[in-house]
Design a protein with these regions (language model features):
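Active-site and ligand/interface coordination hotspots across diverse enzymes
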Residues: 20-35, 47
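Loop/turn elements at helix/coil->beta-strand transitions in domains of secreted/extracellular proteins
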Residues: 33-35, 84-88, 132-135, 161-165
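Positively charged n-region of N-terminal signal peptides that target proteins for export
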Residues: 1-4
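C-terminal motif of bacterial Sec signal peptides marking the signal peptidase cleavage site
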Residues: 16-17
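Surface cap/lid and interfacial helix-loop subdomains adjacent to catalytic sites
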Residues: 115-132, 153-298, 302-311
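Gly/Ala-rich beta-loop-alpha elbow adjacent to hydrolase catalytic centers
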Residues: 140-144, 148
Length: 313
């Protein structure tokens, strides 16, 4: 069945006012979907000057260029990793800018936390008005990964029981985070209700502390192992075709990539050669799509065995 657009009947985007009661979403629905993927975008905006001459450190989704920046990533992630059995939801949120987060990294957490407040409001709206009793996958990249960690802590127990899995991509899950009952590290290919976390580097020395320096978990996004078992695969994206090997460093919990011959843009202010933060989704897009589908299948198999067919929030 061809993927179709949202229940609101727009061509690609749901255009609604940015407000607490009705957040603004990109929505792509599929009338055959049995699961939802709720995605939170990474940092796609830069500092800007308002009409009063002030430097602004948060995006403004009423500005077309800010909205377009998020749309570009969101649409790309939808097309790359969302299985045919999932509908896709992603909030347009007034995220912190790249300079606002990384020029002074002591501001990273408080500014991400402020932006995440909108994400939580959007998720609550999604659960109440758009979820329609579907199990759901959470996924966030970089700043969006921070939001996923905080959103996991925000879930009610009943909501947590309906989560297929959470993907924290290009960000860390700390020992403190793991003390929360909704955050449990993935151990294999198809366990459910778990949190998947990975950060990719050529070597552990290329890690960026503010993003992955304190991560307490990691999994290899090719073989989905938490052991140091190498996985060789073909990376074919953007005209590149390289044979790569992904190995989990069980001390740093980082994924070590060997064989990559291309370039990766350095993150402003904190970037290091050999850090593959800009490639966290392209490096593994085929494996991610397959893994999301596997975990969704496992979730629905469990629900069938439990004779549980609907959820109420």
């Amino acid at each position: 069945m061809i993927k179709q657009i949202s229940i609101f009947g727009v061509l690609l985007l749901l255009w609604t006012a940015c407000s607490h009661s009705q957040p603004d979403f990109y929505i792509r629905t599929n009338d055959q979907a049995t699961t939802d993927l709720f995605y939170i975008c990474s940092t796609e905006t830069a500092d800007w000057i308002n009409t009063q001459g002030d430097t602004m450190h948060f995006a403004d989704m009423t500005r077309p260029e800010h909205r377009a920046a998020l749309y570009s990533e969101i649409r790309g992630v939808d097309s790359l990793v969302c299985p045919e059995t999932c509908s896709f939801y992603a909030p347009y949120y007034n995220q912190a800018t790249i300079e606002g987060l990384l020029r002074d990294t002591t501001l990273f957490i408080p500014r991400c936390a402020k932006a995440t407040e909108e994400v939580m409001q959007a998720f609550d709206y999604y659960m109440q008005h758009l979820n329609h009793d579907h199990p759901f996958v959470l996924m966030g990249y970089s700043q969006g990964g921070f939001a996923v960690v905080e959103l996991l802590k925000h879930l009610t127990p009943e909501q947590a029981s309906c989560m297929v899995a959470a993907y924290v991509i290009g960000y860390q899950v700390t020992e403190s985070d793991l003390r929360h009952p909704s955050i449990r590290a993935a151990q294999c290919t198809n366990d459910i209700g778990v949190t998947i976390c990975y950060n990719s580097v050529a070597s552990a020395e290329a890690a960026i502390p503010v993003l992955s320096g304190n991560t307490a978990i990691g999994i290899n996004p090719i073989n989905w192992s938490t052991e140091a078992t190498p996985a060789t695969y073909v990376f074919d994206f953007g005209g590149v075709s390289d044979t790569l090997t992904a190995t989990l460093d069980t001390l740093s919990h980082l994924t070590l990539i060997e064989g990559y011959k291309g370039t990766c843009s350095l993150i402003p202010f904190v970037g290091k050669p050999g850090n593959y933060h800009c490639l966290e989704i392209p490096l593994y897009y085929r494996s991610l799509k397959e893994n999301i589908a596997l975990r969704c299948e496992a979730k629905h198999g469990m629900l069938k065995n439990d004779n549980t067919t609907s959820f109420r929030y």
